[in-house]
Amino acid sequence: MIVGIGIDIIELNRIEKMLDGKLKFMERILTENERNVAKGLKGSRLTEFVAGRFAAKEAYSKAVGTGIGKEVSFLDIEVRNDDRGKPILITSTEHIVHLSISHSKEFAVAQVVLESSSR
């Protein structure tokens, strides 16, 4: 049973401006593992990576109904890729999490669907 749905869209140029010489932004948004992946990226690929993670975390927080804040922070949520490249969301939730991330020339978008783990 679906228990939550969240979606977020972000302009890539907004993330690009925040990344411009601001390591603190990445430290606030990305987990250590995500920052390690980001170190190998440059230019538009780095912007897309960070924007996709930002959107995924915002979408998750909306799906759980809290938004980013006291109950859920950016660092409580990690986005990884499985063996086939599919993004997966790692968090402490008891729900099954379905995540989709997409990019265009100007935007990154993510959708999260939370499914009850009891069937």
From Swiss-Prot:
Assigned keywords, A-Z: Cytoplasm, Fatty acid biosynthesis, Fatty acid metabolism, Lipid biosynthesis, Lipid metabolism, Magnesium, Metal-binding, Transferase
Compartment annotation: Cytoplasm
Catalyses which reaction(s): apo-[ACP] + CoA = holo-[ACP] + adenosine 3',5'-bisphosphate + H(+)
Residues bound to Mg(2+): 8, 58
EC number(s) reported in the record: 2.7.8.7
Residue ranges of coiled coil: none
Any one GO CC term of the record: cytosol
Cofactor(s), names only, from the UniProt record: Mg(2+)
GO biological process, one term: lysine biosynthetic process via aminoadipic acid
GO molecular function: holo-[acyl-carrier-protein] synthase activity; magnesium ion binding
Disulfides per UniProt: none
Family: Belongs to the P-Pant transferase superfamily. AcpS family.
Stated role: Transfers the 4'-phosphopantetheine moiety from coenzyme A to a Ser of acyl-carrier-protein.
Protein name as annotated: Holo-[acyl-carrier-protein] synthase
